[in-house]
Every structure is written in structure tokens, then in C-alpha cells.
Regions:
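Residues at the C-termini of beta-strands that transition into short coil/loop
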Residues: 45, 96, 200-204
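Conserved functional loop/turn residues at catalytic and ligand-binding sites
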Residues: 23, 139, 265
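Glycine-rich phosphate/pyrophosphate-binding beta-alpha loops
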Residues: 269, 287-291
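Loop/helix-junction capping segments adjacent to catalytic residues or to phosphate/diphosphate-binding pockets
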Residues: 10-13, 102-103, 128, 156, ...
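Acidic, Mg2+-coordinating active-site environments of NTP-dependent enzymes
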Residues: 29-38, 144-280
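Phosphate-binding loop of NTP-binding sites
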Residues: 48-184, 188-196, 241, 247-248
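N-terminal leader/targeting and accessory segments in enzymes
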Residues: 1-53, 232, 252
Length: 291
């Protein structure tokens, strides 16, 4: 199905005939400029809005448990870690790359199949109200915020604005009696501890307690079990802890979680490790936000 969506540079309505010729079964259009007499064309007021509504409708017809996450940074890495852990035991889908906006989120939800057990959906934003909007499309069962940092301040103004915007996810979760995933080491997240949640921490007051063993290639310990990864940087500590917490919460054996973390390697310029002439080079050029 081809959705004729208007963008900043192109209008999808101009490519309807080409899409049908290349095999699209139907085309959703919202412009009178499409003068093709074809039973495969469905005319609507808003192609993008139709895509979003279709994605939400599709999500309600599945039995998949949906986990939504947002944050100033670490979203994509955490999403991939959670996906890696859950996939070790369940049929899981997740957002491809960083398809985390008003178009990418619906496309991600439409990946869910009848036998998909878990779906990990990344939500991104650079203005107030966007996380709330995407959350209402996604209808998650669980919500997690990686962190709050000084990113997208052109829209959020300051750190208080970032917190207000990102916690739109938590507010929806609370209002709909779903489950928060909280990092108690983050004082902002800990404020939500009186609501339905699963939590992790370096202290003694969370559901899952972790200890950082190594900050070069991140290794952590929960109870007497050690989890090793191929990920560099102690800034990834909470990302790994979140993935382990979710895996343990859903009953995945610790050995499977260990194997999943051992197999995961970062790509696409995100703390990516390159071996050149016997030297290890860490390529971390993807993100330019100052957090």
C-alpha cells in the first residue's frame, strides 16, 4: 500500500501512478491533483493521519506487548539492546534505525504480526506534545525514559522543558494504568516510584540492583550473576541495566540474557568499535547532542 504523504520537499501524490505501476496494491491519496481513474486509489482528507490511525487500529488488533521508550540520548542503543534480549526468547519486532517520528512510529507498528509477542517502539521529539501524540498512536503497555539531557533546546528551551516533554510518556502510562520502567539512579524518574512500575538501581531500593564491574567494555552484576557486553563507555551502563531488567521481568533465563548481550555489537557510528592495524578505534560520530 502506498501512502501519498506530503513532505518538506516532495508531495507523494505526484508519485501515485509510478507506485501503482511498480506493484502497489492500493494508493491512499489526499489531493485533488491525482486524476487517475483507478479502483486502487482510496481518497482521504489526510494521508498521514490515515496512516497513523491505521497503525493504531492495527496495534489494537494484536496481542503483542508493546514497550515504548524515549529520552534525550541512548534511545536507539537501548531499543536495540532490549530487542536483542527479548528476541532471545520471544518473537520480537522493534523500530528500524531511528524511525521514531510521526511517520516512523506508525510504520514500526505496522510491522507487528499476529504471532509477534513483543514490540519495542522508539519515540522521538523536538517539541512539546510530540511524545504525547506518538504515545497515543503507540498505546504502549510499558514505558521507559533513557535520560533527560540538554538536547533539542530549540524546542524545549531548557532542562525543565526537556523533563516536561519526555515525561509525557510516563503521564500517559500512569493515566492508562500501564507500567513504568524506572531507573531509580535518576532522581527525576524516582519521583514516579509511587506509580505502577518495575525499577532498577545501583542502591537497595529497586526491584533489580546492579553493580558496574567494568566501564571499558561494560560488565554488570545482578545478585551473583555477571553480564558482559561488547559495548564501551560507562554511559551505556543504564542502557544495559534496562535491557537486563526487562528480560528478567519477562522471565528470560539469565544465561540467555548473557548470550544475547555478548552477541550484540553497536553499528552505524554509535560507539562502534573498529579494528585497524591492530588498534581499536571507537567511532562515536552519529550523535551531536551535548548531553
Amino acid at each position: 500500500m502506498f501512502f501519498a504523504i506530503k513532505g518538506d520537499n516532495f508531495d507523494g501524490n505526484e508519485f501515485v501512478e509510478e507506485a501503482l505501476n511498480k506493484g502497489a496494491k492500493y494508493a491512499i491519496v489526499d489531493s485533488d491533483s491525482v486524476n487517475i481513474d483507478n479502483s486502487k486509489i482510496l481518497r482521504v482528507k489526510d494521508s498521514l493521519g490515515t496512516l497513523q490511525k491505521l497503525a493504531t487500529f492495527h496495534r489494537t488488533k494484536t496481542n503483542s506487548i508493546v514497550i515504548a521508550l524515549t529520552g534525550s540520548n541512548g534511545k536507539t542503543t537501548t531499543k536495540e539492546l532490549i530487542d536483542c534480549v527479548l528476541s532471545s526468547n520471544f518473537k520480537t519486532i522493534s523500530t528500524k534505525g531511528n524511525y521514531n517520528n510521526h511517520i516512523g512510529v506508525p510504520l514500526s507498528l505496522l510491522q507487528i504480526e499476529d504471532d509477534t509477542e513483543y514490540s519495542v517502539i522508539e519515540l522521538g521529539a523536538n517539541n512539546f506534545g510530540e511524545i504525547d501524540f506518538l504515545t497515543k498512536i503507540t498505546l504502549p503497555d510499558y514505558g521507559y525514559i533513557t535520560n533527560f539531557g540538554k538536547a533539542h533546546l530549540e524546542g524545549f528551551i531548557d532542562i525543565e522543558g526537556v523533563i516536561k516533554a519526555k515525561t509525557e510518556l510516563y503521564n500517559w502510562i500512569i493515566e492508562n494504568n500501564k507500567t513504568l520502567i524506572l531507573n531509580f539512579d535518576d532522581k527525576q524518574q524516582k519521583k514516579f516510584r509511587n506509580h505502577k512500575n518495575i525499577s532498577f538501581t545501583s542502591e537497595d531500593d529497586g526491584d533489580y540492583k546492579f553493580e558496574l564491574i567494568s566501564g571499558k567494555k561494560i560488565s554488570v552484576k545482578n545478585r551473583d550473576i555477571k553480564y558482559h557486553s561488547n559495548i564501551y563507555g560507562d554511559y551505556n551502563y543504564s542502557n544495559i541495566c534496562a535491557a537486563i531488567t526487562i528480560g528478567l521481568h519477562f522471565g528470560i533465563d539469565s544465561i540467555k540474557i548473557q548470550d544475547a548481550l555478548n552477541s550484540y555489537e553497536l553499528q552505524n557510528n554509535r560507539s562502534q568499535v573498529l579494528n585497524m592495524n591492530g588498534k581499536e578505534i571507537i567511532l562515536d560520530a552519529y550523535n551531536a547532542n551535548p548531553t
